[in-house]
Regions:
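Catalytic cores of alpha/beta
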Residues: 81-100
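Structural preference for beta-strand elements that scaffold enzyme active sites
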Residues: 5-9, 49, 78-82, 103-105, ...
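Glycine-rich beta-strand-to-loop/alpha-helix junction loops that act as flexible
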Residues: 53-55, 82-87, 106-108
Length: 139
């Protein structure tokens, strides 16, 4: 049997836990207004990791930095956080790792800077992952 881990996702938009349909903001449903409560639910149900996406940052419209920092403080040493969305610089990567994020998921930044990513992978070791969003035949 192959071992695998499920990472429940928390997509943050304006501090709320949301779900987008086909990645469109206009097709958004808020399913929890307290991300701490949502992550506590995942922790109570045995999950070891949570995947958080900052949709505000991903869409280039502010960010959920304060909310994410509160999550990191609330769950330090309890659950690992994997973070993606709007991370577009080495400074962003360093900031979030230094703040306690266990793994950074890079998307567009990685594709636009492949040589830099090769160097970063040496520096940050197992702290980076590559995220691909596919739509029909487009990445």
């Amino acid at each position: 049997m192959t071992n695998f881990q499920i990472y429940p996702a928390v997509d943050l938009k304006d501090g709320n836990c949301v779900r987008l349909v086909h990645g469109k903001e206009k097709n958004m449903t808020i399913y929890e207004d307290d991300p701490i409560k949502q992550i506590q639910f995942f922790l109570n149900n045995g999950f070891k990791w949570v995947h958080i996406v900052d949709l505000n940052a991903a869409f280039g419209k502010s960010n959920n930095k304060k909310v994410i920092l509160k999550i990191l403080k609330s769950f330090k040493d309890k659950i690992k956080i994997q973070l993606g969305g709007g991370i577009r610089s080495v400074e962003d990567i360093r900031y979030w790792i230094d703040s306690g994020v266990s793994r950074i998921v890079l998307g567009t930044f990685a594709f636009n800077n492949p040589d830099l990513i090769n160097n970063l992978s040496d520096y940050f070791s197992k702290k980076l992952a590559l995220g691909l969003d596919l739509s029909l035949i487009h990445i």
